[in-house]
């Protein structure tokens, strides 16, 4: 027995295994775990509280209830350890064994395991090739099944009712065939299966099948059959003969007072199983009638089902209080299940929580810890110190002292706490800056003090927030806390590399106030000798004089002065320089570190919040961390002091309502009335009127706001030239301390348009502002949107958290594994330009990335930066100055590292500003960076009327000087002399003087081009414009128009606008009427050249989609360039712009959008093949090769006409592109670019900056899988989805001359990707636990514990950060062990070769669970490396 405890405990140490395998337990395996059979349903005796013998809590099976004491009390105490009492049969040992010993129930009839039956796809069903419905009929005793048809005409696996069975037996004789019912029959069929034979049959069928749908089904079955063969699981183990019973301490029964018991639901479920099982045994012994026995067997099957997974089949079994009982599956599932509640999240000792208050006098690395809390948290350390100092003799005395809080204790607490960091955490911890380390400073009171600058990282405010404190105990933990987690080491945000320790609110206001200039009197000028005029200003020699002048009030903080400011030169020597500045700015300048790279100029300006952030950024880049921290602390103190000294406040008169407001509102009202009139006259539609009204009012609101801002900003001077005080509200808003122009607009401008909860905008705006007060109606209108905002916020938090969870799950195992993967692939980066303005410059996008090619200055041909360099700020500046347009960089997307990313592809660690370290968990950082701002995103989908959204995108302006170049763009000049583009996918490029492309735009069909090809343009020139609301059909030659298949009433109707009475001819959809076969009507316009008759085929045809408005009449003569018809772009007009969180989730989940665009898969000419009832088929015919067909619903507007030439990747039907199509047609880089741009778009609208590389890391994780197109000579099957690594492994195993497998990359959404990771532990702890575990156990999966999550679950250091080094050491150590072991084996074999008989004897135990050497190693460490894990046999062979 001692061996056994030694052995089990040995296994319990987490270091002793390398992988975890999951499989299906055989009945023998279950019996071998068990310490005895449970025969009775009793639990404990209600009077004595002792467990009943042979019951569910039996002490004989599971172990003693009290430590070292048998049940009857004959043997007590340690000395009898290991004795088995002869009276009660209980072994004397620790009671802890009741947590680990299992029992079992021998079933009187086999039952099917519900997981393998009902978890879709049903494994039993796939193996037997039966439908689940039929299987259930057999298992639940409704039908018989023919297991052996013999010579009868019955089919194998045919279902028979009882009557049919009797008939068949009468007809063919009882012994001619065999049929069974229930789990016994299924078990017999499973035992009968010959898996190898089945596999051969399936492979043959796969090779010969002709149908399209068959292969998928065959592959499914084949995979199950193969996984059974490979894993060594036997199919019949899916049918249970023995049910294991988990240890009693894991399903406790606790007596409550009053003689009642609180019990775990599992006990009820087990009791049910035992009762039914015993009843069944008795019935079988009594030879009861078949029907009774069968019913009892069915009930047994149902009770075992409920035990394993209650509610999976049939009714949920409920307890006494009508609550469903929690089955074994429920114990694992969900947030409260074993995985997420106990393995991934645990409660922590040595922790406390309290309210936080601000601590402005703290240094950045400190926090105030209440004495009471510290005393409790550091207790063990205090005891140790008291003992070491010899102050207290015993632990008891030490405890007393601490409880009495004697003064010695406080002194010792001070010693203990010194230099011992504590961790502070504010929930919700959305990113890694939500837990930071500080050095505690003991304070009176009961609240924790927090340094104001770290609030933004914790997202904390002091309105009652609470924070938790944790104490790192071990030396290593303290070291990590100090070196990695100290608040001073987290100055930059990991999401975007910008400082996150930035003053906010009061501090910003104080600094802004300090850095302002205010004119005291009209400036006087002195004329120099050379005639230049210099302003006459007070001059100061140094800071001391300035201080004195301020004290004597001879200057104010804002007076313009000339002063000498000490600067450091390149060698660090001080030198004095003159600056025109103000005393206030000099105070800020005093805080700057003395460094020649940080000149006084950077604070010699008006400092807003953004500017202060830039200053801190520059200080950090040039002078390092220590100086930055000192600087940050200094300006914090300065900011607070001067905000308080300035005494800035505002009253109602500071909100100035502009006088021009009335006039603007009157004008707008006139305009709106005008639009109303136009609508009445039928010149515009209802939708257009709505758009225009909304447009007019939003313009009016902006104008009022602008007038108000001008009024507030304006500087007024009195007669002496003294400037009036600056408006306080403006100061607060402009400095970035509090408030925004939008809020000021509501206070003193006009509130503007409001939205309904549906997201639509109400046409009547709120004209008043808060200063004037709202009318009742206006107030009511505004409550609408406000209430929705509050409801949204609640939903948002949950949604955002779930998105973060999915992101973390998909990317958790993405870690930096090596320095450089040496790949040649790269991504092309260029600036993002939208609507003529640069949104993200090239420099911003490539900062901190590794270059792939040399970057060359186009003008001078010199190399600016060499390939392979990590770009830092100065290099990026040089690149931007040389106006480089495109750079190729390394990216996590193209990295070829195994099981992670390499440092070169990732580039700079944003939170440190240095190259990333090996072991950095970049996946988790990426997930947090994207998920953390999630709560700031909106939840709503915007329904924006066309005008408001699309008026910006109806023209193009040039962003640079250069010449225009049209690519693939045929044009035509109409009779007005305008140049029209006839290209579906033409590009308009602007080329500068050096021949570099400055911008490339795709312009829609029918665009009016402003310039001839090759014309010179200046920055800001208009290049093109188009109508965003309709898609024209333009004639390319002159001729006569003929209507074809345009029949009044069927395909053409005159639509009159109700309000206006103006008629338009609109093509309608033709629905087949009557019985007769519908004529195939293809409404189209044909253009005949003059003098052509209709049957000649040269005519141009234009097919019309339903909803097209005709602009010409039948037989009209038209010129080239005329518009024949307009297809309304209704789709684009009020397309809901899915905004915010839902959009981000949609992109990451790789969902196919609702109206998805159709993309051309190849280049070629368009041909309309034929029409069907609701669809039309069009084909793209390439110059060589096969045509590709598309089926397109007739209601969709097709962007191309017959005969057009399209390029691969062009859109045939506009809409949101489908990411899967982009991947198939245009490849990985295009997809990454698309996802990055789209996701960044959402965040950019909210003003959130996230570095592209985080999105790239997630997209990389979504592209891990490939779909096999050709299995080659490997075991992989075409159509199967496997990890890219798996495909590479399979190919690597092939010999020479064999054909490797090939595959295409597949895009998986984040949820799907998480569920398909190679680690089943990680997948099971994410979602759909039962499904994942069922699948894994069938395949006999091994979890190699590579990712972070699996290691947290089994309780190890994670293989990232400081754990990465340990991990590498473990791997090398185990490799050496394996080598030594192999050597030792060889020696043993040599010795054994002498003695054949000994060898035979040695073989037997080796077939046990572990091979003998691994066993020996596990017992007592082994020859080489102490307790490094014994290598699994396969690994040592590799």
Swiss-Prot record:
One of its GO terms (biological process) is DNA-templated transcription. Its cofactor is Mg(2+); Zn(2+). Transmembrane segments: none annotated. It catalyses: RNA(n) + a ribonucleoside 5'-triphosphate = RNA(n+1) + diphosphate. Binds 1 Mg(2+) ion per subunit. It holds the Pfam family RNA_pol_Rpb1_4. SMART domains: RPOLA_N. GO terms for cellular component: DNA-directed RNA polymerase complex. GO terms for molecular function: DNA binding; DNA-directed RNA polymerase activity; magnesium ion binding; zinc ion binding. Its EC number is 2.7.7.6. Residues 1413-1427 have a biased composition (Low complexity). SUPFAM superfamilies: beta and beta-prime subunits of DNA dependent RNA-polymerase. InterPro entries: DNA-dir_RpoC_beta_prime, DNA-dir_RpoC_beta_prime_bact, RNA_pol_asu, RNA_pol_N, RNA_pol_Rpb1_1, RNA_pol_Rpb1_3, RNA_pol_Rpb1_3_sf, RNA_pol_Rpb1_4. Residues 1413-1438 are annotated as: Disordered. Mg(2+) binds at residues 461, 463, 465. Keywords: DNA-directed RNA polymerase, Magnesium, Metal-binding, Nucleotidyltransferase, Transcription, Transferase, Zinc. It is an enzyme of class 2 (transferase). Zn(2+) 2 binds at residues 821, 895, 902, 905. Zn(2+) 1 binds at residues 70, 72, 85, 88. DNA-dependent RNA polymerase catalyzes the transcription of DNA into RNA using the four ribonucleoside triphosphates as substrates. Belongs to the RNA polymerase beta' chain family. The RNAP catalytic core consists of 2 alpha, 1 beta, 1 beta' and 1 omega subunit. When a sigma factor is associated with the core the holoenzyme is formed, which can initiate transcription. This is DNA-directed RNA polymerase subunit beta'. The gene is rpoC.
